[in-house]
């Protein structure tokens, strides 16, 4: 490819504080192992007036997953070496237990454990300890799809992986990372700090320019799925290590970034803690990270030996910034989608009965819709009277049915339009035997509210909103991890006499949790 258009790239970077508004951040572009651009702005701590620098450490959150998998490959070998240990770990499973490779590739079908903490009554700013993580993970008995058939993001996959690595080696993951990954890669200040409450070198901020920015409170312990703190310079060193070892057939990053497939042979979007994407016909590998008050993203294009890194100490869209930086570095112009007018027949709520997942669509203007299906809203471009798509989802409407496809997830669902009013007779207490947790629903002044109770405590009351007959939505916008699960979908079940017998509770991260009415 021709040389990078440095003025265009610099102009984009210098506009980041205006386009991604927040306290501070740091970004870099690396090509051929050399630093093209390295820039920090703003403040690491607004109150202390401490400036952000390329040496400032920040939590890299889920970007840590690739390093956990790197330790696995470097210290133990192929994932199958730990399959018997996983069987002992998930000894409550009834059938269809995943393999360790499924954990590494986010194909396990396990429900995300941070989402499950909500159902177990956790407070968003509560304390979460290592024994509580094992308590939750070891009680699991089922998956929300057959392992190897689909993709679903699950932090618990990598928490379990960390436990298995430590058990197998007899050493702490922190020591293994320092010795086998950080030292060879010259990541001089990178460190595993599992307790988020202990990190105080830089402050992460909740909020925005409308509500203001407030220091985020985090008191969770995470391991394997996240926990590494690193500076921009540390992350640059990782990209340079990747470039130095690019010709090594057994090089760590070559092994981590190798293509993966689903059980049916279809290409998978994720492997060994790395997300696979494509831009302008070029394959990218990388990962994002999030915690309340923090966002980061790295991308690597092996074909062109280019990497981009974005680190924010606020909840800005680091993934968007990193991809746009990559496109600028690759000389890929912004896409110009062709949009059609929105047909009102799109708008409303749609249910897939098999998964209990709900798709909500509303007009966003300019030939776009706002869709709620996963962890956060998506903007869908309407490309025809009955077709719409985003970067993740394709929709095709046929009257009162929408065919939803998420190719990367190997997921195809028939969504049926919800029509009619919801009955108000849902108040009561419901029990999940698998989680040993309760859902309490009450009616106050004609409005329905719900609360979760379990071994982690009793949650606040959350309002419920009717989506259709026996289908309700319970939004949860703050939780221990970020992003939050979003809208929980509640699908109620009745007997022949019309009495409610139970409810299926789920979201994209944790589907199909069955509760029976007490």
Curated annotation (Swiss-Prot):
Keywords: Aminopeptidase, Hydrolase, Protease. It catalyses: Release of an N-terminal D-amino acid from a peptide, Xaa-|-Yaa-, in which Xaa is preferably D-Ala, D-Ser or D-Thr. D-amino acid amides and methyl esters also are hydrolyzed, as is glycine amide. It holds the Pfam family Beta-lactamase. Residues 477-487 are annotated as: Important for specificity. Homodimer. This is D-aminopeptidase. Transmembrane segments: none annotated. Substrate binds at residue 481. Residues 373-392 are annotated as: Disordered. GO terms for molecular function: aminopeptidase activity. NCBIfam families: PRK13128.1. It comes from Brucella melitensis biotype 2 (strain ATCC 23457).
